[in-house]
Design a protein with these regions (language model features):
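Solvent-exposed, non-transmembrane regions of membrane-associated and secreted proteins
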Residues: 7-273
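Positively charged n-region of N-terminal signal peptides that target proteins for export
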Residues: 1-4
Length: 273
């Protein structure tokens, strides 16, 4: 009888140990599936949206791209949600002159634009894909707790994720959350690795130019850099005392050739945790 009890206890302890070991794997798989579903819903939503005609909305069609917006990788003049696009462009244009004075911890949590005011009804505003880090996560406007628990969060008072000259879209993500691995893979990235940013209109391709560990209360590096098209992604370190940051840049077109601006930047962390 005693031996049976000991065997039963051993089996229970073994199963409990296996559960503890396997839970992060299970939780990560569940979170990844939820993120895939959110991305699929985003793609279906924008695929079924209809671009307005020139007669119904002349603003939607342009012969030349805005100077503040990088050339479209889809090379299309017609855009769905043209008023939302124009709002994003306008916000990015005025940001360099107001970003530092408008900065506060609270401003980072608020969306820079309320997309629903322009007819956008999806929660996600896009998604980020980083093959080398095994990351593909939906993106939400405003780096508040609710958004960060669901995927990547675009900091308020940083550029809207449409690219262009003098922009710096800054994305925060949990390293892990409730046992699931989220943005921990950022630590795998090396200079030159590809990062793809998909917004409601197109997919923009960036490449890593630097990685660095920084203090959480520095703010300079989330600021726009004049003339540059930047994407900054960060997560917390373990333990949660620093921020691991990855800065990326889009190609700069010069005539028929494409060159890289490999200037290394100073870095900053958001106070968000």
């Amino acid at each position: 009888m005693r031996n049976r009890i000991l065997i039963a206890l051993a089996v229970i302890l073994l199963l409990a140990g296996l559960g503890v070991l396997l839970y992060p794997t299970y939780k990560t798989a569940a979170v990844r599936e939820q993120e895939r579903q959110e991305i699929a819903a985003f793609e279906e939503y924008r695929a079924t949206a209809t671009a307005p005609t020139a007669e119904s909305n002349p603003v939607a069609l342009t012969d030349e791209p805005s100077e503040t917006v990088a050339p479209s990788e889809t090379e299309t003049a017609e855009r769905i949600f043209p008023e939302l696009w124009e709002a994003c462009v306008a916000f990015n244009e005025q940001l360099p002159g107001t970003q530092r004075t408008a900065y506060s911890a609270d401003s980072l949590r608020r969306p820079s634009i309320k997309a629903s005011d322009y007819g956008w009804e999806q929660e996600a505003f896009g998604y980020i894909s980083i093959p080398a880090a095994e990351i593909e996560a939906p993106l939400y406007l405003g780096a508040n707790s609710a958004n960060m628990n669901k995927g990547g969060a675009i900091l308020g008072q940083t550029s809207m994720p449409i690219g262009g000259k003098s922009t710096n879209c800054v994305i925060a993500g949990h390293r892990t959350w409730s046992g699931a691995i989220q943005f921990k893979g950022l630590e795998k990235l090396q200079v030159g690795d590809e990062v793809r940013l998909t917004n409601p209109w197109e997919t923009l391709t960036y490449h890593v130019i630097e990685t660095k560990i920084v203090l959480p209360d520095t703010v300079d590096e989330i600021m726009v850099q004049e003339g540059r098209d930047l994407l900054t992604v960060f997560t917390c370190t373990s333990p949660n005392t620093r921020r691991y940051m990855v800065i990326c840049e889009r190609e700069i077109e010069e005539g028929a050739s494409k060159t890289w601006n490999w200037i290394l930047l100073p870095w900053v962390a958001s106070p968000l945790r």
